[in-house]
Curated annotation (Swiss-Prot):
Changing residue 444 to A: Does not affect binding to lst-1. This is Fem-3 mRNA-binding factor 2. Expressed specifically in the germline (at protein level). InterPro entries: ARM-like (IPR011989), ARM-type_fold (IPR016024), PUM-HD (IPR033133), Pumilio_RNA-bd (IPR033712), Pumilio_RNA-bd_rpt (IPR001313). One of its GO terms (molecular function) is RNA binding. Residues 1-37, 609-632 are annotated as: Disordered. GO terms for cellular component: cytoplasm; nucleus; P granule. RNA-binding protein that binds to the consensus sequence 5'-UGUGCCAUA-3' in mRNA 3'-UTRs. Involved in the control of stem cells and sex determination in the C.elegans hermaphrodite germline. May also play a role in the hermaphrodite germline proliferation and oogenesis. By binding to the 3'-UTR, represses phosphatase lip-1 expression in the distal part of the germline mitotic zone. Binds specifically to the regulatory region of fem-3 3'-UTR and mediates the sperm/oocyte switch. Negatively regulates gld-3 expression possibly by directly binding to two sites within the gld-3 isoform b 3'-UTR. Residues 615-632 have a biased composition (Low complexity). Interacts (via C-terminus) with gld-3 isoform A in an RNA-independent manner. Interacts with dlc-1, and is required for the localization of fbf-2 to P granules. Interacts (via RNA-binding domain) with lst-1, probably displaces bound auto-inhibitory C-terminal tail and alters its RNA-binding affinity. Keywords: Cytoplasm, Developmental protein, Differentiation, Repeat, RNA-binding, Sexual differentiation. Changing residue 448 to G: Slightly reduces binding to lst-1.
Length: 632
């Protein structure tokens, strides 16, 4: 707390009478002698705060000798429990007398939040206490004080959210300041005060309920004129927290009323929104009005409204905005592709793609576009020309994505786009392109990335068997072991905080294939033997490193996966060979007699790179800092 503020708010206040609205009542007995009046002043220690420790204790005696009976308080109410233990107070037993209180000391770190608030967090003349106290205390025979601390009805710290009707016109309120129960919509429309009702919570709720009822033609005309008839009023209501709901309702009524003014109203609505398209898209409340208009307007006018979207950097701002991105998603959902094809071309631009995909809201826009272009491939209502347009747009966007798939796969948000492409069977062509162009020969490094490891998992789960075999071979035999430690790619990934999830995925795939839960045939060729060979290699490595693995939750999951397979689906050659390594007790936690066999190395948090067996690249050992995974 600011020292200057502390000095201002914590000065002792001397009052001979009860201050107004303090919640402290004083009931004096008949007057005593002048000397008796100076003997028993009362000090309220519930109000003292740390500044009290800097005061001169002699001030208390001076107040007691020269002032009449008084109550000394300070704000904010910060209770103090340890003051009476100070040696200084032992000399003044009759001067300093604590008032009972029901809170603990504010010096304790675990005290309530209200004890740590500043003076600005409280009302001017309100005392806040945690419980009501109504006690009488007698100090000697000269004076009786009756103190009553009551919880205030309203303070800045415990603010009541009861609505104030200051916005509504006085003629609409009753004697209690509330809206009249028999108020009608016609009165509001005839008065010309509809704007005041629309920006008030209760007033807007009244209008919302009223317009849903049966309306006369004249009432509709008045609504249209006062809500969507004037541009300034329309924009003011559209950007208001309450008024935007009324605008949406009136737009729905307007578009459902097919009278002589139907076309004129829609054209006017389109012009109003088009003139402020960017600002309304970026507004938290006006963006809902745009979405409602796109949903309900005639398609021809809605398409013209889409053309009002900017084609420059402002479109990036709309795509990555928390509110405006929903406008783009609504355009993609309800407007034909030929009217928003420019959005696809804009997003597919390399620099724009990087900015939009790397944003938490922009990545959702791109994924929505991909989903729409993919889903329309099954739409039989589309003409051949529309299908050709869809395929070309999808190809342009996918080409831009695959050219930067490695950069996108390692991004916090863009990796979801790559995951979606890899896991979607309708995008199998682009999935294979991503695996071959981006993931192959980089599996070890990407598996050690926090976000790219999810992409690698999806690739193992959804890759065609031919590519899956290449990926498995790369992990098992695609890298030269480290010259100093002898670690190969599987060993590094098995004990890495992110790579271990990829190994678990590989193990699950092999177990499912061997147990018959996964298809092993593709293109007339059965890969069952390959799955058995991969499982043997994984089983051998888990057996070898069982003690280290049993120390981590990820390792225990690998051990448990093999143990479950042993109990439900016996492995042919492993079981027939009499090897008992699938028994659960064989994977028990390492004991103290294991000695050097138990290494001290834990889960790796850095990225260890190995040299591929192919001569395409040679990478030295490199560690990069990453955040630890909560599972380990």
């Amino acid at each position: 707390m600011d020292q200057s503020k502390m000095r201002r708010t914590n000065q002792f206040r001397k009052t001979s009478q009860k201050p107004p609205s303090t919640g402290i009542d004083s009931y004096p007995t008949p007057a005593q002698s002048p000397m008796a009046q100076h003997e028993t002043p009362m000090w309220d220690f519930n109000s003292l705060n740390p500044y009290f420790s800097m005061l001169n204790m002699n001030d208390g005696i001076n107040y007691a000798r020269h002032q009449q009976n008084h109550i000394v308080t300070s704000r904010p109410p910060t209770p103090l429990t340890d003051l009476m233990s100070l040696r200084s107070f032992q000399s003044f037993p009759n001067v300093f007398m604590p008032v009972s209180r029901s809170r603990t000391s504010s010096f304790i770190q675990s005290d309530t939040d209200s004890s740590r608030l500043e003076s600005d967090d409280f009302s001017q003349n309100v005392r806040c206490f945690s419980a009501d106290i109504d006690r009488s205390k007698s100090y000697g025979s000269s004076k009786h004080y009756h103190l009553k601390y009551s919880r205030p009805a309203l303070s800045r710290n415990s603010r009541s959210f009861t609505r104030s009707n200051n916005v509504l016109p006085t003629w609409s309120l009753d004697s209690n300041g509330e809206m009249r129960s028999r108020l009608s919509l016609s009165e509001v429309l005839d008065s010309g005060d509809l704007m005041k009702f629309a920006v008030d919570k209760t007033g807007c709720q009244f209008l919302e309920k009223a317009v849903k009822g049966s309306l006369t033609s004249y009432q509709k005309f008045q609504l249209f004129e006062q809500v969507i008839g004037r541009k300034d009023d329309f924009l003011k209501l559209s950007t208001n927290i309450f008024g935007n709901y009324l605008v949406q309702s009136v737009i729905g009524i307007s578009l459902a009323t097919n009278d002589d003014g139907y076309t004129k109203r829609q054209e006017k609505l389109k012009n109003f929104i088009s003139s402020q398209m960017t600002d309304m898209c970026l507004d938290k409340f006006a963006c809902r009005v745009i979405q409602s208009s796109l949903q309900n307007m005639d398609l021809s006018l809605a398409c013209k409204l889409v053309q009002a979207l900017p084609r420059d950097a402002r479109l990036i701002a709309i795509c990555v905005d928390q509110n405006a991105n929903h406008v783009i998603q609504k355009v993609v959902a309800v407007i034909p592709l030929k009217n928003w094809e420019f959005i696809v071309d804009f997003v597919a631009t390399p620099e724009h793609l990087r900015q939009i995909c790397s944003d938490k809201y922009g990545c959702r826009v791109v994924q929505t576009i991909i989903e729409k272009l993919t889903a329309d491939s099954m739409n039989v209502d589309l003409t051949s020309a529309a299908q050709n347009l869809r395929e070309r747009a999808l190809q342009r966007l996918m080409t831009s994505v695959t050219n930067r798939c490695q950069e996108l796969a390692t991004n916090e948000y863009a990796n979801y786009i790559i995951q979606h492409i890899v896991s979607n069977d309708d995008l199998a062509v682009y999935r294979e392109c991503i695996i071959e162009k981006c993931l192959m020969r980089n599996l070890l490094s990407l598996s050690q990335e926090k976000f790219a490891s999810h992409v690698v998992e999806k690739a193992f789960l959804h890759a065609p068997l031919e590519l899956l075999a290449e990926m498995m071979d790369e992990i098992f035999d695609g890298y030269i072991p480290h010259p100093d430690t002898g670690k190969d790619a599987l060993d590094i990934m098995m004990f890495h905080q992110f790579g271990n999830y990829v190994v678990q995925c590989m193990l699950t795939i092999c177990c499912d294939a061997v147990s018959g839960r996964r298809q092993t045939k593709e293109g007339g060729y059965d890969h069952a033997i390959s799955f058995q060979d991969w499982l043997k290699k994984l089983h051998s490595r888990v057996t070898k490193e069982r003690h280290r693995l049993s120390r981590f939750s990820s390792g225990k999951k690998m051990i448990e996966t093999l143990a479950n397979l042993r109990s439900t689906h016996p492995i042919y050659e492993l079981q027939s060979s009499g090897h008992d390594s699938f028994k659960t007790d064989y994977f028990s936690t390492a004991s103290e007699h294991d000695g050097p066999e138990l290494e001290k190395n834990g889960i790796e948090e850095g990225s260890l790179m190995l040299e591929p067996r192919s001569n395409k690249s040679s990478v030295s050992v490199k560690f990069s800092s990453s955040g630890s995974h909560g599972d380990d």
